[in-house]
């Protein structure tokens, strides 16, 4: 099932947390949930050129704190903070709570799955060869510290008459391992031949803080050191022992 399910949803509560962090009574839950959906749709639409990866919404008492994770924070803030004031006014019109907006810069957008998927989708819309776009994204991610990446592109690639799926993978992407930090993102390219879907999985390493067995194993390896491990001898250096007094002649 790890191959089919959304890797982010599978790991919620294990090594990932929710993008909406608030509690509401039964009567208000639906209203606040729809507010979150509308706020996210508006922000992703308004900040299409700002490389927004995700929007986290928190609701303390009678307040609404919106945190925008962006690869280009300068585009979000605008000149002297003018654009962020406009965003705050628009969000205030959608909710009755007092609105606060925070901007967090994404240091390595090349290993953010959503931003990688959107970048490939934009290149497909500009008629860049899909293989070149996928290979370039894979190389950039591996160069900047990703332990593995997989990219799927599906649709009428290159204007072909029959839709197909093309994929590239480099490194390791363990989808069944729950302690693995796997980021997942999707995007859609609207081309003249139709839509093309892009899916990206990025493996950033294993999170071992909450796994006591993994911590004990790692600590034991560090204490033992590399020299205490038994070394395997080469095939030519093996000593052949005495094979005994076995009779090699013909049996009577």
Swiss-Prot record:
<feature type="region of interest" description="Disordered">
    <location>
        <begin position="212"/>
        <end position="252"/>
    </location>
</feature>
<dbReference type="InterPro" id="IPR004087">
    <property type="entry name" value="KH_dom"/>
</dbReference>
<dbReference type="GO" id="GO:0022627">
    <property type="term" value="C:cytosolic small ribosomal subunit"/>
</dbReference>
<keyword id="KW-0687">Ribonucleoprotein</keyword>
<keyword id="KW-0694">RNA-binding</keyword>
<dbReference type="InterPro" id="IPR015946">
    <property type="entry name" value="KH_dom-like_a/b"/>
</dbReference>
<feature type="domain" description="KH type-2">
    <location>
        <begin position="39"/>
        <end position="107"/>
    </location>
</feature>
<dbReference type="GO" id="GO:0006412">
    <property type="term" value="P:translation"/>
</dbReference>
<keyword id="KW-0689">Ribosomal protein</keyword>
<protein>
    <recommendedName>
        <fullName>Small ribosomal subunit protein uS3</fullName>
    </recommendedName>
</protein>
<dbReference type="GO" id="GO:0003729">
    <property type="term" value="F:mRNA binding"/>
</dbReference>
<dbReference type="Pfam" id="PF00189">
    <property type="entry name" value="Ribosomal_S3_C"/>
</dbReference>
<dbReference type="GO" id="GO:0003735">
    <property type="term" value="F:structural constituent of ribosome"/>
</dbReference>
<comment type="similarity">
    <text>Belongs to the universal ribosomal protein uS3 family.</text>
</comment>
<dbReference type="GO" id="GO:0019843">
    <property type="term" value="F:rRNA binding"/>
</dbReference>
<dbReference type="InterPro" id="IPR004044">
    <property type="entry name" value="KH_dom_type_2"/>
</dbReference>
<keyword id="KW-0699">rRNA-binding</keyword>
<dbReference type="InterPro" id="IPR001351">
    <property type="entry name" value="Ribosomal_uS3_C"/>
</dbReference>
<dbReference type="InterPro" id="IPR005704">
    <property type="entry name" value="Ribosomal_uS3_bac-typ"/>
</dbReference>
<comment type="function">
    <text>Binds the lower part of the 30S subunit head. Binds mRNA in the 70S ribosome, positioning it for translation.</text>
</comment>
<dbReference type="Pfam" id="PF07650">
    <property type="entry name" value="KH_2"/>
</dbReference>
<comment type="subunit">
    <text>Part of the 30S ribosomal subunit. Forms a tight complex with proteins S10 and S14.</text>
</comment>
<dbReference type="InterPro" id="IPR009019">
    <property type="entry name" value="KH_sf_prok-type"/>
</dbReference>
<dbReference type="InterPro" id="IPR036419">
    <property type="entry name" value="Ribosomal_S3_C_sf"/>
</dbReference>
<feature type="compositionally biased region" description="Basic and acidic residues">
    <location>
        <begin position="212"/>
        <end position="221"/>
    </location>
</feature>
<feature type="compositionally biased region" description="Basic and acidic residues">
    <location>
        <begin position="231"/>
        <end position="252"/>
    </location>
</feature>
<dbReference type="InterPro" id="IPR018280">
    <property type="entry name" value="Ribosomal_uS3_CS"/>
</dbReference>
């Amino acid at each position: 099932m790890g191959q089919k399910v959304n890797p982010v949803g599978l790991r919620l509560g294990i090594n990932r947390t929710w993008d909406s962090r608030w509690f509401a009574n039964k009567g208000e839950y639906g209203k606040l949930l729809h507010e979150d959906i509308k706020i996210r749709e508006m922000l992703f639409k308004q900040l299409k050129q700002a490389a927004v990866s995700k929007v986290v919404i928190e609701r303390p008492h009678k307040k609404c704190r919106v945190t925008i994770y962006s690869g280009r924070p300068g585009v979000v803030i605008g000149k002297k903070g003018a654009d962020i004031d406009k965003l705050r006014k628009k969000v205030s019109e959608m909710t009755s709570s007092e609105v606060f907006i925070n901007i967090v810069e994404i240091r390595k957008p090349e290993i953010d799955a959503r931003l990688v998927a959107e970048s490939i989708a934009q290149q497909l819309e500009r008629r860049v060869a899909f293989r070149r776009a996928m290979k370039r994204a894979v190389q950039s991610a591996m160069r900047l510290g990703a332990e593995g990446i997989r990219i799927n592109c599906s649709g009428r690639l290159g204007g072909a008459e029959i839709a197909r799926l093309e994929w590239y993978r480099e490194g390791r992407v363990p989808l069944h391992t729950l302690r693995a930090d796997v980021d997942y993102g999707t995007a859609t390219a609207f081309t003249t031949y139709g839509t093309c879907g892009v899916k990206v999985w990025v493996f950033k390493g294993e999170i071992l803080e909450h796994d006591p067995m993994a911590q004990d194993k790692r600590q034991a390896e560090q204490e033992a050191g590399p020299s205490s491990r038994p070394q395997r001898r080469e095939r030519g250096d093996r000593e052949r022992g005495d094979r005994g007094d076995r009779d090699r002649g013909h049996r009577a």
